[in-house]
Amino acid sequence: MNTKIFKSAVITSFISSCMLMGCNSNRTNDETNSANQMNALNLTSEWDKTFPKSEKVNHSKITFHNRYGITLAADLYTPVNASGKLPAIAVSGPFGAVKEQSSGLYAQQLAERGFLTIAFDPSYTGESGGEPRYVASPDINTEDFSAAVDCLMNREDVDSEKIGILGICGWGGIAIQAAINDPRIKATVASTMYDMTRVNANGYFDSENTAEQRNFKRAAMVAQRTEDYKSGFYKSGGGVVSPLPDDAPQFVKDYYAYYKTPRGYHKRSLNSNNGWNVTSNLPFLNFKFFDYADELESAVMIVHGDKAHSFYFGKDTYALLKGDNKEFVVVAGANHTDLYDGLSVIPFNKIESFFNENLK
């Protein structure tokens, strides 16, 4: 196969693929409602994460809802023997992953360091609700972070003035977008971030940044939605390409090494399996993140490996932010997926210090 053609096809396919208590800790009707929601969502009771459970934290499952009425499922992590009101962090990502993968690892690590954390599945994915399944939306997914903040604000074990968020990969960009619109969020970390609106509109490395190329994508996707309506079935874009050809781009090989091997595979992960619905890309072509990034007053830390194919997303987004409470942490030698689960690579000490400084 022609290498150039293969890489273009793989990259286009990958963009398609990437795309038991209540939240209130009092025993009230909210708890009964949440229990009913959990039963409706059929949440698993087993520990099915891609990482071992820590003895330093307590774990349970909770649910909450966004303002579109979608019920989201989350894992709650709290430090063992914690008391009083804690600073809290909501975590999600990577884009096309589930809470049993990278976001859960981050949440557990931060709970070990004294924070109450939740790792949640976005709308339409994982154990969360929403139909049809495997849909991504720049609006609804941004709302998901604010819905997580709603949940945390109403917990009696959370200090409502000390709430932060952390997004990984595509959810890093979504986290920053959420923080722009939600001043309740006092601190945001974007780890190995993507700007999903930019990559969908412009292609990787801005290689498809013309009106003609965008219109070609639009035409292809609206043709697909016509076919989806006719068939009554939403075509999936496919997860990470498998089997992996030798001439795949290095970053696709890195994704394969995480999503398609025992290291990070999960049965509910879109990227590990069949990916997003193809038409999920469409709204990202018509929606631009960070137009008001210079108005974001709260603290932001962007963490990126300098060997990541996605490094330019972090670098360029950081340049849009204003204020001395913004920080860009470069992890020397790290690629994109090293920051998914690399406990010796992810700068947890810096992340902990950042949240301690800004959630006080």
Q: Which residues are covered by each model-predicted region?
A:
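Catalytic histidine-centered segment of alpha/beta-hydrolase-like enzymes
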Residues: 334-345
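Alpha/beta-hydrolase-fold enzymes
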Residues: 177-260
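Short beta-strand element of the alpha/beta-hydrolase
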Residues: 85-94
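N-terminal cap/lid segment of alpha/beta-hydrolase-fold proteins
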Residues: 39-84
